[in-house]
Amino acid sequence: MIIPIRCFTCGKEISSKWEPYQELLKIDKGKAEALDELGMRRICCRRMFLGHVDIVDKLLKFDIVKDFTQRS
């Protein structure tokens, strides 16, 4: 899904660091090293990135509106 705007535990804003994090991973940085470089020191904020599963592209494959119009 879409990365949350704030950390669920401490409330720190984390969404602005998602894209730089993805870019660092693309240039073969380790996950821990990328988070350190972005200044994410708190365990709660780090787990928000490490536990995130990006499934938006998979969800967009299902078009509910199309199914309803075909049944009518």
From Swiss-Prot:
GO terms for cellular component: RNA polymerase I complex; RNA polymerase II, core complex; RNA polymerase III complex. Keywords: DNA-directed RNA polymerase, Metal-binding, Nucleus, Transcription, Zinc. GO terms for biological process: transcription by RNA polymerase I; transcription by RNA polymerase II; tRNA transcription by RNA polymerase III. PROSITE patterns: RNA_POL_N_8KD (PS01112). Zn(2+) binds at C7, C10, C44, C45. Belongs to the archaeal Rpo10/eukaryotic RPB10 RNA polymerase subunit family. Component of the RNA polymerase I (Pol I), RNA polymerase II (Pol II) and RNA polymerase III (Pol III) complexes consisting of 14, 12 and 17 subunits, respectively. This is DNA-directed RNA polymerases I, II, and III subunit RPABC5. The gene is RPB10.
